[in-house]
Amino acid sequence: LCLDVGQGDGFLLRSGTTNILIDSGSSDQKKLGSRTLEPCLKSKGISRLDIAVVSHGDSDHISGLLYLLEQKMPIDLLILPAGGKGGEIYGQLEQLQTEAGGKTYYMHQGDKIKAGEMEFTCIFEKETEEERNAHSLVLCSHYKDLHILFTGDMGISEETELLDLAEENGSIQQEHLEHVQILKTAHHGSKGSSSPAFLEAMPLKAAFISYGKDNSYGHPSGQVTEEMKKQNISLYETGGKGAWTLESKARNVIIKRTVKSRGEN
């Protein structure tokens, strides 16, 4: 489920009884946690999470999760970027998780985690980069025949580094990129991410772009959306269109709208 969080990011993955949240924050929905995220989870009968992943610590990726942690929602494992260890916001998240009785792990490039039938591999992460967007976790999720790439707010510089690593035969970057069908577009479709070379490196069928309608940043960039259309990548945008459900059945993937955005007729 690609959540409609306004100007931010949020993805909920489910397989059987396994529930995983990847980011959940917004810069324009000040009560995202209580008004959107918590009601969404309750409507699906979710009272605990197996894993919550923070790609990086910007508020438009964590504000909803912060609320859940403050409410002491049970989260078995909180995953944070190793590059952010020692940063104030990551320390705050870790402390709240500890107080709620859960474990925290700082993820490194090459790490793998399994949850139910889902497997997650970190294929890129800058451990020495202080700038949050640049140390975003880049995760490839693998569920049966479905591969999704989650990119946080990585920029073109990081994409280039990732592609350089992928040129090495047998590398985890090459192994995973060549199978990615679905992309969670970096940085809300900003022109500072999603270079043509990066998009071309994957056999992409679809891309999700999460952003707030009429946002002041100009997201998504027309340059990015036009390039995706040029490469025959189907676009699924939250701004003005709401949340999207992605369902994997056998070898088929079904994507459909689920919730209308606020103010939409």
Give the residues covered by each predicted segment:
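Non-globular, low-confidence helical/coil segments that flank catalytic cores
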Residues: 1-265
